[in-house]
Amino acid sequence: MTDLKSPQTDQPTSSFDEVLPAHSAALYREFQAGRVIVRELWDNNRSELVANPLYNLLYNHLSHFRTFYEHLGCLLVFNDEGSFFFLKESSDDEAEEHDENAFRVQVVLLLIGRYFARSGRDLEYLARPDAGLGEQDLVAMGADDEYLEILRAARFEKGLSEALDYLVKRNLMFSSGANRYFLSSAGMHFLEELVREYEQA
């Protein structure tokens, strides 16, 4: 007679056995905070981009996490061009909240892109840690009444600093020093997408 309590050594392992619960929980917290999971993160101590272990975890166990989040009512999306992952909500209430967050992100990215293009610089520099937005840029944008009005319409009452912080908290932008910012691969991808849509309109 078989002992039901003893594990069978020849049984196939579940994909859950391959991922530590602490790692799954860390990923879940990132997504719940509205962040995208980018391939590289900015390390302030080393002043360079470093590999994101959570990105590698998702990439190496993609099938497992797609199924896992599907059971939670979400769609795990991998964007190959921008090298990042994000969650799409499936319920109407959450989709509405997602739309508002997406709108606010788009407003900030469009303002940054518009300002950068007007200053005669190539948008690609926005994704470089040694370039991006500097102190003079922040002062100029913060003094522009039109920009501030647009930001207020998107519910950024405190102006540019609140808007930039909104992107930083979502891994769409990094702060590389005092009054210095640059777009992550995900932030740059979304900006390029917005520019393409604008040019086709």
Q: What is the predicted function of each stretch?
A:
Residues 71-78, 164, 168-178:
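A short, conserved structural fragment
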